[in-house]
């Protein structure tokens, strides 16, 4: 009984953050249900929610950056629509408090796992569209992403981390970085990778985690780029 009350409170808070109140609360519950908890879980919702999210953010960027090419817009969208951003957003909304997880996932801290949080966000966008319509779901996404789109740094974010680091090193006439898997934690379908990024002659090595090798490499590259730009900023050419 106490758990039910806590879940209801969590769901009320989540709806407030979404800016949308469900008429059929069972849709929200399913959106927050992991497959480890019940057969009626959120994976099919994710499929729809992912499409709603990608379209809406694409349209927001299309309108905000009229001079960007298709490739630049795609890279910019990828910097906003990814597991890291969605998990961060979910954490800000305390989505983990409203999740339904199986005993194993609950014990292993699944309510904090980025992949589970990100999936729940996508599933909720679908749930809104089922409860109302596509336009309402689009408004929810716009509400949540407006500030992130407004403050996105095009110069840095339009390129993925590895590309930006490579170009920054080449501009300074340094060798390309080397990436190496330091550790792989967990099972095949639920792994966490620890990747190192070595800048060689610069004597800097950083490590980052990700739920895939690619994601971890991108995070390590971003960390290395941040260090490089702080330690060896390029001098701006005089006009």
Swiss-Prot record:
- Please give the biological process terms from Gene Ontology that the record holds: mRNA processing; regulation of gene expression; rRNA processing; tRNA processing
Molecular function (GO) terms for this protein are: double-stranded RNA binding; metal ion binding; ribonuclease III activity; rRNA binding
Q: Which GO terms describe its cellular component?
A: cytoplasm
Superkingdom of this protein's organism: Bacteria
Q: Which SUPFAM superfamilies match?
A: dsRNA-binding domain-like, RNase III domain-like
Q: Which reaction does it catalyse?
A: Endonucleolytic cleavage to 5'-phosphomonoester
Cofactors per UniProt? Answer: Mg(2+)
Active site located where?
50, 122
InterPro entries xrefs = dsRBD_dom, RNase_III, RNase_III_dom, RNase_III_sf
Which keywords fit this entry according to its UniProt record? Cytoplasm, Endonuclease, Hydrolase, Magnesium, Metal-binding, mRNA processing, Nuclease, RNA-binding, rRNA processing, rRNA-binding, tRNA processing
Q: Where in the cell is it found?
A: Cytoplasm
Outline the extent of the DRBM domain: 160-230
The primary site where this protein sits is: cytoplasm
Annotated RNase III domain ranges read 11-133
| Amino acids binding Mg(2+) | 46, 119, 122
UniProt cross-references to PANTHER family, sorted A to Z:
RIBONUCLEASE 3, RIBONUCLEASE III
**What does this chain do?**
Digests double-stranded RNA. Involved in the processing of primary rRNA transcript to yield the immediate precursors to the large and small rRNAs (23S and 16S). Also processes some mRNAs, and tRNAs when they are encoded in the rRNA operon. CRISPR (clustered regularly interspaced short palindromic repeat) is an adaptive immune system that provides protection against mobile genetic elements (viruses, transposable elements and conjugative plasmids). CRISPR clusters contain spacers, sequences complementary to antecedent mobile elements, and target invading nucleic acids. CRISPR clusters are transcribed and processed into CRISPR RNA (crRNA). In this organism endogenous ribonuclease 3 and Cas9 are required for correct coprocessing of pre-crRNA and the trans-encoded small RNA (tracrRNA).
Assembly description: Homodimer.
Protein name as it appears in the record? Ribonuclease 3
**Annotated organism of origin:** Neisseria meningitidis serogroup A / serotype 4A (strain DSM 15465 / Z2491)
